């Protein structure tokens, strides 16, 4: 599913979408490797989106909320070599406020996996262009305070309801015309809060 309003896009992370894009834009993505062990479909879509954003000279910074060890952030940094890249994460695993909310809301029955095996230094050491990276360590949205930038590409990979909906509320109004928000775990049954947050924002904003 892709939703487009005035050039702004919210992407549901589904294999169907990636295969459809691969077929439609075969000159950008090798169709035979999308969604296979040889090609991460998220990276394939990121590559396509980066080419379009660069091709049309779309302004704005890039960002990722939910960086963990920097695997996907490294790809964003690679495909947007001239873009400022904001990296939002606690770098200490999930915040107890977010996990408690999901459990109390019935979105989860148990504490999610631990993602604390990371650090700012580890993430930055993986970056091709670390000089472009701005690390915002702590609880989102508090760590977004004072940011005046607009954004051309945003990855939301925070798994839980509260950070995902906070990310959408912060980034969507700041998304430039033609910008992209990529949302991970929309169809991941282990993290239903991600889907719930997206649906609420779409319903509230009439993004059908």
Where are these regions (language model features)?
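A short alpha-helical cap/connector motif
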Residues: 1-208
């Amino acid at each position: 599913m892709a939703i487009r309003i005035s050039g702004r896009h919210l992407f549901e992370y589904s294999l169907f979408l990636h295969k459809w894009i691969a077929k439609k834009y075969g000159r950008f993505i090798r169709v035979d490797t999308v969604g296979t062990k040889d090609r991460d479909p998220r990276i394939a879509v990121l590559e396509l989106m980066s080419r379009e954003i660069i091709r049309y000279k779309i302004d704005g910074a890039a960002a990722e909320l939910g960086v963990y060890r920097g695997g996907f952030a490294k790809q964003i940094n690679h495909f947007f070599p001239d873009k400022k890249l904001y990296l939002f994460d606690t770098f200490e695993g999930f915040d107890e406020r977010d996990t408690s909310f999901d459990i109390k809301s019935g979105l989860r029955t148990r504490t999610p996996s631990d993602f604390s095996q990371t650090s700012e230094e580890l993430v930055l050491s993986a970056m091709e262009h670390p000089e472009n990276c701005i690390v915002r360590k702590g609880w989102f949205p508090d760590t977004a305070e004072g940011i005046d930038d607009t954004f051309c590409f945003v990855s939301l990979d925070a798994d839980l309801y509260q950070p995902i909906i906070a990310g959408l509320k912060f980034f969507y109004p700041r998304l430039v015309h033609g910008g992209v928000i990529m949302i991970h775990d929309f169809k991941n049954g282990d993290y239903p809060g991600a889907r719930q947050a997206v649906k609420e924002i779409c319903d509230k904003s009439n993004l059908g």
